[in-house]
Swiss-Prot record:
UniProt keyword list: Electron transport, Heme, Iron, Membrane, Metal-binding, Mitochondrion, Mitochondrion inner membrane, Respiratory chain, Transmembrane, Transmembrane helix, Transport, Ubiquinone
Pfam families assigned to the protein according to its UniProt record, in alphabetical order: Cytochrom_B_C, Cytochrome_B
Organism of derivation: Synaptomys borealis (Northern bog lemming)
Miscellaneous: Heme 1 (or BL or b562) is low-potential and absorbs at about 562 nm, and heme 2 (or BH or b566) is high-potential and absorbs at about 566 nm.
GO biological process: mitochondrial electron transport, ubiquinol to cytochrome c
Cofactor note: Binds 2 heme b groups non-covalently.
Protein name, per record: Cytochrome b
Cofactor(s) the record lists: heme b
Gene Ontology CC annotations of this record: mitochondrial inner membrane; respiratory chain complex III
Gene that produces this protein: MT-CYB
Lineage: Eukaryota, Metazoa, Chordata, Craniata, Vertebrata
Residues reported in the UniProt entry to bind heme b b566: H97, H196
Family: Belongs to the cytochrome b family.
Length: 380
C-alpha cells in the first residue's frame, strides 16, 4: 500500500496533500476551517445538483418549481433547506477563516492570500445569483437593486446593466443566465481551491506563534485528519439543527411571495452574510462612491500585506493590535445589524460611523499600532 501511495502518479498527489503533508504541530482549531469550507463546497455542489434536476429557470414556473421540490420531491424539502442553510454555514466558515488569516498574519503568504480573495469574490457572486433563483419578491428586487449599481459606472454603466439583464429590466433572460452562472461557478471555485492549496503547500501552513515551524512538523494523517473529522461532525450537527428545527430563520419572509415587478417590498435587503457590505454601500450618499466602497470593503484585504508594519507576524503577542482587531470584529457585527435596518435616523448615522471606523482601523490604526509595538519591544 505504501508503494502505491508514494509512487502512483495520481495517488501521490493526494498523499502529498492530505497524508504525508508536513504540518506544524501546534496549529489550533482555527486551522480547521479550510477543510470545513471544502466540506461546505461539496455539500453545496451535491445538493445543488439534485435541486437543478427539478428546478426550471423560467419566470413563470421558477417559484412553482421550488414549491414542487419542497412538496412533491422525495426529501426535496431537506435538499432545498440544506442548500439554503449550507450557504450560511459556508459564509460563517469563510468569515472565520479570513478572520483567522488576519489575526495570525497569514496574509504574508501573498499568493495564497490573493487566491483566497478571488475565491471570496467568486463565492459571493455565486451566492448572490443563487438567491435570485427562487424568484420570490426579495430575489427579484435584490437582483434589480444590486445589478442596477453597475449603472453608476461612467459612460458604459447603463449599457452594461442592460447587457447583464438581457433586456430593459430583470426578466426571463436574467433568470436563465443567472441559473447558468450559478451552476458553473461552483466548479470554477473548486478549480480555484486547488490553486489556493497549491500555493499554500509551496510555503507550508502558518501557525499560532507566527514563527517558522520547519523544525517541528508532524504528518497530516492521522493527527489532523481526525481533528478535521471532529470539526466536520460539529459543522454537520450545526447545519442539521438549523435545517431540521429552524430552516427559515435566516431567510426573508418576503421570498415566500412570488416576484411582482409592480410591488416593491418595504425593505429590500440581501441575505445576512452580505449585510455588512450593504451597510457600507448605503452609508455613502453618492451612488458611484457607494459602489466603490462596497468593492473596497472586500478588496481592502488585498492591501493587508502592504499595511503590515509589525516585526512580528501575527497579533498573538501584540495587545494594542489585538484591541484594534476585536473592535474591528465588533464593528463588522454592527454593520451587519445596520444593513438589515431601514434607512432612517439613527441607523444612517450609525452606519456611516461604523463604515468610517471599518476602513480607519485597517488602514490607519492597525499599522500605527504595529509601529508603536515595535518601539515598545525595541524591534525597530
Amino acid at each position: 500500500m505504501t508503494i502505491i501511495r508514494k509512487k502512483h502518479p495520481l495517488i501521490k498527489l493526494i498523499n502529498h496533500s492530505f497524508i504525508d503533508l508536513p504540518t506544524p504541530s501546534n496549529i489550533s482549531s482555527w486551522w480547521n476551517f479550510g477543510s470545513l469550507l471544502g466540506l461546505c463546497l461539496m455539500i453545496q455542489i451535491l445538493t445543488g445538483l439534485f435541486l437543478a434536476m427539478h428546478y426550471t429557470s423560467d419566470t413563470t414556473t421558477a417559484f412553482s418549481s421550488v414549491a414542487h421540490i419542497c412538496r412533491d420531491v422525495n426529501y426535496g424539502w431537506l435538499i432545498r433547506y440544506m442548500h439554503a442553510n449550507g450557504a450560511s454555514m459556508f459564509f460563517i466558515c469563510l468569515f472565520l477563516h479570513v478572520g483567522r488569516g488576519v489575526y495570525y498574519g497569514s496574509y504574508n503568504m501573498i499568493e495564497t492570500w490573493n487566491m483566497g480573495i478571488v475565491l471570496l469574490f467568486a463565492v459571493m457572486a455565486t451566492a448572490f445569483m443563487g438567491y435570485v433563483l427562487p424568484w420570490g419578491q426579495m430575489s427579484f428586487w435584490g437582483a434589480t437593486v444590486i445589478t442596477n449599481l453597475l449603472s453608476a459606472i461612467p459612460y458604459i454603466g447603463t449599457t452594461l446593466v442592460e447587457w447583464i439583464w438581457g433586456g430593459f429590466s430583470v426578466d426571463k433572460a436574467t433568470l436563465t443566465r443567472f441559473f447558468a452562472f450559478h451552476f458553473i461557478l461552483p466548479f470554477i471555485i473548486t478549480a480555484l481551491v486547488l490553486v489556493h492549496l497549491l500555493f499554500l503547500h509551496e510555503t507550508g501552513s502558518n501557525n499560532p506563534s507566527g514563527l517558522n515551524s520547519d523544525a517541528d512538523k508532524i504528518p497530516f494523517h492521522p493527527y489532523y485528519t481526525i481533528k478535521d473529522l471532529l470539526g466536520a461532525l460539529l459543522l454537520l450537527t450545526a447545519l442539521m439543527i438549523l435545517v431540521l428545527f429552524f430552516p427559515d430563520i435566516l431567510g426573508d419572509p418576503d421570498n415566500y411571495t412570488p416576484a411582482n415587478p409592480l410591488n416593491t417590498p418595504p425593505h429590500i435587503k440581501p441575505e445576512w452574510y452580505f449585510l455588512f457590505a450593504y451597510a457600507i454601500l448605503r452609508s455613502i450618499p453618492n451612488k458611484l462612491g457607494g459602489v466603490l466602497a462596497l468593492i473596497l470593503s472586500i478588496l481592502i484585504l488585498a492591501f493587508m500585506p502592504l499595511l503590515h508594519t509589525s516585526k512580528q507576524r501575527g497579533i498573538t503577542f501584540r495587545p494594542i493590535t489585538q484591541t484594534m482587531y476585536w473592535i474591528l470584529v465588533s464593528d463588522l457585527l454592527i454593520l451587519t445589524w445596520i444593513g438589515g435596518q431601514p434607512v432612517e435616523y439613527p441607523f444612517i448615522m450609525i452606519g456611516q460611523v461604523a463604515s468610517i471606523t471599518y476602513f480607519a482601523i485597517i488602514v490607519i490604526f492597525m499599522p500605527i499600532a504595529g509601529i508603536i509595538e515595535n518601539n515598545i519591544l525595541g524591534l525597530d
